[in-house]
């Protein structure tokens, strides 16, 4: 295990940092003095933190939930300028990052706590390689409190794979919808990434951990296929280092232990009287 922290990146990767976005997805619910339950009030998808502001009735109470998504190795997919999961609103409709609230009593961003995330080419994954933080505040009173502060909690884990290429054939490592493929001529694989958990509500709690299966399939030159699986323990805010090396049965040497050449002597007496 390693503590999760920033690391230096090659220039080629650093150049891509500029295109990465940070999203703030916000749902606001309102409860009037005579209401028993909260009702939908407003929602919005923002990329500019300074634009997140909303007028509230001082006589009412409010509940706010927010999901912050920072792109890393993966980017959130947008179709025709509208972002898909986890930023869908209403009946699975994409949402544009307008940096403004939409007032609605009928729909809002309904996938903030789901793991499903649409990335490149619309591919849906449960463990995207990006950072998610989730937080809520209940019974906020504009009259009693001036500032609305939400405690945002990380719902992420890290995996650092170090894989030695096979000495023959092809090796495929699969995990959480991702895969690593190496052959004898491949360079050693050494890569780390940050992933978001699929259960956002539980994953932002201290001490959260879950398991994930990692499968290794080795196809040898003669067509023989060897398969093994291992369960990894994933911990919140922990980078887990996974070292993988496959080896076939090594040739067995033949050892011949020869009997010593020393011979004992036995006498045979044969007296003939003819």
Located regions from the model:
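Short structural boundary motif marking the start of a folded domain
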Residues: 1, 24, 157-159
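Structural motif
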Residues: 1-19, 162-170
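Tryptophan-paired
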Residues: 16-80, 85-87, 169-238, 268-274
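Structured interaction patches on ligand/partner-binding surfaces of diverse proteins
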Residues: 45-48, 72-146, 220-249
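Residues within well-ordered beta-strands of beta-sheet-rich folds
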Residues: 65, 160-162
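Compact mixed alphabeta submodule
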Residues: 142-149, 164-167
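Conserved "repeat-terminator" motif of extracellular CCP/Sushi domains
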Residues: 148-156
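Hydrophobic, glycine-enriched assembly/anchoring segments
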Residues: 242-274
């Amino acid at each position: 295990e390693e503590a999760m922290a920033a690391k230096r990146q090659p220039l080629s990767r650093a150049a891509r940092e500029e295109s990465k976005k940070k999203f703030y997805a916000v749902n606001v619910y309102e409860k009037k003095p005579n209401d028993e339950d909260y009702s939908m009030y407003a929602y919005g998808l923002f990329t500019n933190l300074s634009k997140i502001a909303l007028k509230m009735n001082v006589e009412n109470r409010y509940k706010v939930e927010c999901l912050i998504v920072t792109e890393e190795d993966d980017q959130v997919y947008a179709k025709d300028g509208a972002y898909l999961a986890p930023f869908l609103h209403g009946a699975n409709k994409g949402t544009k990052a307008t940096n403004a609230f939409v007032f609605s009593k009928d729909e809002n961003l309904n996938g903030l706590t789901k793991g499903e995330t649409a990335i490149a080419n619309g591919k849906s994954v449960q463990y995207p390689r990006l950072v998610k933080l989730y937080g809520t505040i209940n019974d906020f009173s504009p009259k009693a409190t001036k500032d609305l502060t939400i405690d945002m909690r990380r719902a992420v884990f890290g995996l650092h794979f170090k894989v030695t290429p096979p000495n023959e054939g092809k090796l495929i490592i699969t995990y959480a919808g991702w895969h690593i493929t190496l052959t004898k001529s491949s360079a050693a694989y050494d890569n780390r990434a940050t992933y978001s958990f699929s259960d956002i509500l539980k994953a932002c709690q201290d001490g959260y951990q879950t398991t994930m299966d990692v499968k290794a399939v080795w196809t040898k030159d003669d067509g023989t296929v060897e398969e093994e699986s291992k369960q990894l323990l994933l911990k919140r805010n922990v980078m887990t280092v996974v070292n993988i090396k496959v080896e076939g049965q090594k040739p067995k040497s033949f050892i011949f232990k020869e009997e010593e050449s020393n011979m004992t002597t036995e006498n045979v007496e044969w007296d003939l009287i003819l």
